[in-house]
Swiss-Prot record:
UniProt-recorded name of the protein: NADH-quinone oxidoreductase subunit A
EC number: 7.1.1.-
HAMAP family: NDH1_NuoA
Cell compartment(s), UniProt: Cell inner membrane
Gene3D superfamilies with a match to the protein in the record: NADH:ubiquinone/plastoquinone oxidoreductase, chain 3 (1.20.58.1610)
Protein's job: NDH-1 shuttles electrons from NADH, via FMN and iron-sulfur (Fe-S) centers, to quinones in the respiratory chain. The immediate electron acceptor for the enzyme in this species is believed to be a menaquinone. Couples the redox reaction to proton translocation (for every two electrons transferred, four hydrogen ions are translocated across the cytoplasmic membrane), and thus conserves the redox energy in a proton gradient.
Lipid biosynthesis listed as a keyword: no
Cleaved signal peptide residues: none
Organism: Chlorobium phaeobacteroides (strain BS1)
Gene label: nuoA
Amino acid sequence: MDQTLSDFGTVFVFLLLGIIFVVGGYLTARLLRPSRPNPEKLAIYECGEEAVGSAWVKFNIRFYVVALIFIIFDVEVVFLFPWATVFKQLGEFALIEALVFAGILVIGLVYAWVKGDLDWVRPTPNIPKMPVLEEDESQVVS
């Protein structure tokens, strides 16, 4: 029990010192730097060029899907690294668990692939045009 509290105490002290350094650096910079705002300093900076248009641009949804898939597999790697370090001590059951975990993610990847979310340039659907039938006036019920 004492060892656990000691470990948590170490983490707490580390976290507290990190917060103190960040806040201290921010406050020191804020107090020491000169503050002389002018329109040129407050303008949007785009690689030294004048800003053209609005900065609020709609991005294609494909960027979002690719980012989500990247994050999912990035988190998978985060979960598999600790497992890989103690692989020999865990035995076959842990291997089966890791394979099931990776298999579920591969099924999700295949689903996204089949759905077409990984295709950057999507083909336009080819919808056949139906012929227009002319109505026979003799069959129209009045």
